[in-house]
């Protein structure tokens, strides 16, 4: 039996109608973990602290938009937990399953009729005087920008410890193949 964490975006799933529908469909077919904040729903699931939701999960199902996946991508990558996205947003590049197709897609998933698409991620480190100030992983992009009203900022970009370029600018955007699609569309270009 698959162990599945379910994370809804409650601003897109009003009243958690689709989350309830998903849980009811999964009941008896999978072990389900969901944030204890939703215990008032009285669903037949394992309620756990939000910070522990991925501790027992083999898979994550997200109900929301691409932003909901992006919030969890780094943690899931670190734990090697595949993410299945159910689109409640507008475009849904990463949340590829439309809500009307949810039961069919989940049935295939439960029968192991799926492939896992691996996506490149970046590790970013923000350094000042060669000391790491901040470090994180990104699935979409890394954006460095100056504070409003400040002058241009000096940046040095390196990959795997090798200097690539130096920039003096008001910002820099570095996108993965996943993130570049959004920038292409914003500029009136095609889906990449």
What does each model-found stretch correspond to?
Residues 91-170:
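Catalytic core of DAGKc-family lipid kinases
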Residues 6, 62, 70, 174:
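Redox-cofactor binding/interface segments in oxidoreductases and associated redox assembly factors
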Residues 15, 67-72, 181-185:
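Short glycine/serine/threonine-rich phosphate/pyrophosphate-binding segments
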Residues 62-66, 73-76:
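N-terminal glycine-rich "phosphate-gripper" loop used for MgATP/nucleotide binding
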Residues 1-59, 100-115, 126-136:
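ATP/NTP phosphate-donor binding region
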Residues 40, 89-94, 190-192:
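Short gly/pro/ser/thr-enriched loop/turn and capping motifs at secondary-structure boundaries
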Residues 162-192:
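Gly/Ser/Thr-rich active-site loops/lids in small-molecule metabolic enzymes
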Residues 31, 80-82:
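Proline-centered loop/turn at the N-terminus of a beta-strand
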């Amino acid at each position: 039996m698959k162990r599945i964490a379910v994370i809804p975006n409650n601003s897109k799933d009003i009243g958690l109608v689709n989350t309830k529908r998903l849980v009811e469909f999964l009941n008896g077919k999978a072990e389900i973990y969901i944030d204890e904040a939703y215990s008032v729903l009285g669903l037949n699931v394992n309620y756990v602290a939000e910070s522990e939701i991925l501790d027992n999960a083999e898979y994550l199902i997200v109900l929301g938009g691409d932003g909901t996946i992006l919030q969890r991508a780094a943690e899931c990558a670190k734990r090697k937990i595949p993410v299945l996205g159910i689109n409640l947003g507008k475009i849904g590049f990463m949340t590829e399953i439309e809500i009307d197709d949810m039961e069919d897609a989940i049935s295939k998933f439960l029968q192991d009729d799926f492939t896992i698409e691996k996506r490149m991620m970046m590790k970013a480190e923000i350094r000042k005087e060669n000391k790491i100030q901040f470090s994180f992983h990104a699935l979409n992009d890394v954006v460095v920008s100056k504070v409003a009203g400040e002058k241009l900022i000096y940046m040095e970009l390196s990959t795997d410890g090798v200097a690539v370029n130096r920039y003096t600018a008001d910002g820099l955007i570095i996108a993965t193949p996943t993130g570049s699609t959004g920038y292409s569309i914003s500029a009136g270009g095609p889906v990449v």
